[in-house]
Amino acid sequence: MTTESKCPFSGGGKPNTPRRGPSNQDWWPNQLSLKPLHQHSSLSDPMDPDFDYAKAFNSLDLAAVKQDLHALMTDSQEWWPADFGHYGGLFIRMAWHSAGTYRIGDGRGGAGEGQQRFAPLNSWPDNVSLDKARRLLWPIKQKYGRKISWADLIVLTGNVALESMGFKTFGYAGGRADTWEPDDVYWGSEKIWLELSGGQNSRYSGDRDLEDPLAAVQMGLIYVNPEGPDGNPDPVAAARDIRETFARMAMNDEETVALIAGGHTFGKTHGAGPASHVGDDPETAGLERQGLGWQSSFGTGKGKDAITSGLEVTWTTTPTQWNHDFFKHLFEYEWELTQSPAGAHQWVAKDVGETIPDAFDPAKKQRPTMLTTDLSLRFDPAYEKISRRFYEHPDQLADAFSRAWYKLTHRDMGPRARYLGPEVPAEELIWQDPIPAVDHQLINDQDIADLKTSILTSGLPISVLVSTAWASASTFRGSDKRGGANGARIRLAPQKDWAINQPAQLAQTLAKLEDIQQAFNNAQSGNKRVSLADLIVLAGAAAVEQAAANAGHPVSVPFTPGRMDATQEQTDVDSFEAMEPVADGFRNYLERQFNIPAEALLVDKAQLLTLTAPEMTVLVGGLRVLNANVGQSQHGVLTQRPQALSNDFFVNLLDMGTTWKAAGEDGVFEGQDSQTGALKWTATRADLIFGSHSQLRALAEVYGSSDAQASFVYDFVAAWNKVMNLDRFDLA
C-alpha cells in the first residue's frame, strides 16, 4: 500500500457511462453545491411511500436469519472459496469496514445506511474483495427482502461470524434503513488512491496533523496503513496514526487495543502475488462483471491465489475459533521484518516453528506473522500496558472486545430509542448519550399557554429566547443522530461553555427559565412537571409566535412535550467536545477564518440538520430578522424592525438600491446606498450568498416578493419546528 503514482486496485479501464459534456462544476469549480441538501429523496427510494422499515424489521424472524447465516459461514462456494473452510474472517472485515468509516468530527460515515454498496466505498482499495462478501450474502438478503436492510444485514453477519467462531457478542440492534444512492461526503482532496502524505493534495500539514474531520491516513483506507505510515514499517510511528484515527472514531486506547487484537484473532490477509495482477475495481469493471471487481490473473485468482491488501498474514493457530494466540504470539515471540509474496512489509516470528495452518492445504503449516500495526500494541508504551493486561487476563480482553465491537457497529445509530430487535442489551452505555425516561405527567394545552405567558413576561427578549432554543436543538446531526434539544445538555459541560453559546448570557437565560420551571412544578399538586428541555423549546416557540404577531401575521408554533433532562453523569464530555460548532451560518458565527468559505460551511451545517435548500433559506432569513446572531452581531440583520418575523432580509438583500463592497474585515461586506454612498447594512458571505448564488437567489426571490410575507412566516415555522424535533425519535 505504498505506491503513490497509481494504485493497482484503481480503475484503469473505460467507465460504463455515456459521454457527456462538462458539468457546471467543471466550468465553475468554486461554485457552491447544494447537492448535499437534496440527497436521499423519495425520487431515489424504490419503497412504497408508506413503507415503515422499523415495522418490517420487527416482523422479521431474526433467529431464522441467524440460522441461515450460521449455515453460510461454512458453505464454501467454488467461485470464492472460504479461507479455512469458514467465511467468518471475511464477514468480520465486511462489517468492520462498513462501520469503520464513521468519524466523530461530523458524524458521517458508519454502517447506518449500507453505504458500502455504493461508490466510492465499494471501490476503495481497503475494501478489495468485500464485493464478494456481499454477493455471498445475496441469497439471504433475497430471501428476507425488505424485512432486513443491507445495512442491518451486514452488521448482523459480522456478529454471527463472531458467534459461529466461539465468541460471545455483547448484543445486536437493527434499525438501519438503507439509502439508495451514495452519500455526498468529503473523504479527502487527494486525486490518487492511497496518495502518500507528501503528495500534492495531502491531508496532512505541520507535524503530521490530520485534516479535520477526516479519520483515515490515506485516501481509500478505513483507518491506517497496516504497513506503517506511508508504508514505513515502524510500529511506534504507526501507533501514533492508530491512536489518532481511532480517537476520531470515538475509540479510546483500551477499545482500540481490544478491537485490533479481537479482530485479528480470526481469518487472514491476502497477498499471494504481485498487485499488478489485480484488475479494475467494481465501479470501473466491465458490465459483464456485474458489479464485481478486482478480477485477478494470478493463478486461479481466488482461494490460495487471492490478492486483497497485498499482505499475507495469519495471526493465530485457530483462525476460525476464538483463542488467546494474538497476545501470546505478540509477547512471547520476537519479530523480524520480511515481505509478503506481493512485496508488502510484514513481520514473521524469529526462531519459531511452523504452527499456523494454511488456509487451503491442511498438510501445510507456516510461521506466525503479524502486521506493523499489530506490533504497535507491544511497542507503544500506552498500548503495551493495556495489551499486557489483556495478555494476562483473557477474560478482560473478551469483555472489552465485545463492548468495543458493539460500539463500533452501533455508534452511528443514535439513542437507544432507535434500536430494534430482541438482542438489544439492557445495559445503557454512555456513548449512547442516554436520557432519562419520562417519569411524570406531561403539560397540557392550558399549561403550555400559561408557561408561554410566563416566558414572554420574564424580561428575556425574543432574540435571546430564539437563539437559546436554536443553540439547544441545532446540535443535532442527522449523520449519527446525536445532539438535539432532548436532554437539555446545553446546560451541562461542555455545551454550556462553548463560545458559540455565549456562556454568560446563556447562564442568565437558563437561570430565568429554571425559575419559571421551578415555579410551575412547585405549583402542581400531582405528578405533572415540565422539563427544562421542553421549556427551552417552548420558549423558542413563544418567541417565534410573538415575532410573527409583531410582523402582523399571528401564527401557532407546534409544540409536543416529552423531552427530559440528562445529567452530567450521563454526558461524555470528551465525546461532546467533538461536536462543538466552529461555524454556524444560521447564527452568522465563524470561530475563525477557514480555507472553506462560510457559505459552504452553512450548507454543511444545513445538511447535518437534514434541511433542504428552501428550509435553509427561510431559516437564515428568519433568524437574521429575529436578531439571533451570536453576540448580537448586526451582520445580515437587514431590517429596521428586529424581532419581527418579517421577510425584510430578502427584500433588502435584493434591493438594487444597495451596492455591496468588501470591507476591511475578512468575510464582511458593507451595503451602501447606491445614490449617496451612505452605509445601510453589513453582512457576511453567509448572507450575500442568497443574492449571489443563482439557485439561492431564486429561492430568495420567492420570499422577497410582495405577496410572500404570510408564506414566509408559515414556512419558517415549519422549518423551525422540524429542527426543534429532529431528535424526537419517540414521536416517530
UniProtKB/Swiss-Prot annotation:
GO CC list: cytosol
Record-level GO BP terms: cellular response to hydrogen peroxide; hydrogen peroxide catabolic process
Site (Transition state stabilizer): R93
Active-site residue numbers: H97 (proton acceptor)
Entry's cofactor comment: Binds 1 heme b (iron(II)-protoporphyrin IX) group per dimer.
EC assignment: 1.11.1.21
Position(s), cross-link Tryptophyl-tyrosyl-methioninium (Trp-Tyr) (with M-249): W96-Y223
Cofactor: heme b
Molecular-function annotations in GO: catalase activity; heme binding; metal ion binding
Location of cross-link Tryptophyl-tyrosyl-methioninium (Tyr-Met) (with W-96): Y223-M249
Gene3D superfamilies recorded: 1.10.520.10, Peroxidase, domain 2
The reaction(s) this protein catalyses: H2O2 + AH2 = A + 2 H2O; 2 H2O2 = O2 + 2 H2O
Region described as Disordered: 1-29
Name of protein: Catalase-peroxidase
Species whose genome carries this gene: Serratia proteamaculans (strain 568)
